[in-house]
């Protein structure tokens, strides 16, 4: 297939077909992998679901708060993620993050 000779619409249609083929291929391979794992687990006398529950997930590390609301010290922020409304309000009123540091 000479893709250089294809029009833009033909190239887009081809890309769409390739994208679908990739998704289908990956799904098929995942199902095959699952079937193999299930067979191995059954040969050893265990249901795969039971074995999968043994997979350890790392506990999320808690991050210490860096900033506190001067008006309500129980409201804190680690400095990660979206700024809480009280931080945005403090910054809008002219305070800096250093003013909110714990």
UniProtKB/Swiss-Prot annotation:
Induction: Expressed in light-grown cells, probably a member of the senC-regA-hvrA operon.
GO function terms (MF aspect): bent DNA binding; DNA-binding transcription repressor activity; minor groove of adenine-thymine-rich DNA binding; transcription cis-regulatory region binding
InterPro entries in alphabetical order: H-NS_C_dom, H-NS_C_dom_sf
Keyword terms of this UniProt record: Activator, Cytoplasm, DNA-binding, Transcription, Transcription regulation
Pfam family, one: Histone_HNS
Disrupted-gene phenotype: Grows normally under saturating light (6000 lux), in low light (80 lux) grows poorly, decreased induction of puf and puh but not puc operons nor genes for bacteriochlorophyll biosynthesis.
Family: Belongs to the histone-like protein H-NS family.
Protein name: Trans-acting regulatory protein HvrA
Gene this protein is translated from: hvrA
């Amino acid at each position: 297939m000479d893709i250089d000779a294809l029009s833009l619409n033909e190239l887009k249609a081809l890309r769409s077909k390739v994208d679908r083929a990739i998704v289908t291929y990956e799904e098929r391979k995942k199902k095959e992998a699952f079937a193999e794992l299930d067979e191995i687990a059954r040969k050893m006398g265990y249901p795969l679901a039971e074995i999968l529950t043994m997979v350890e997930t790392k506990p999320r590390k808690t991050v210490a708060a860096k900033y506190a609301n001067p008006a309500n010290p129980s409201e804190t922020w680690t400095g990660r993620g979206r700024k809480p409304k009280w931080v945005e309000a403090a910054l809008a009123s002219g305070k800096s993050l250093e003013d909110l540091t714990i």
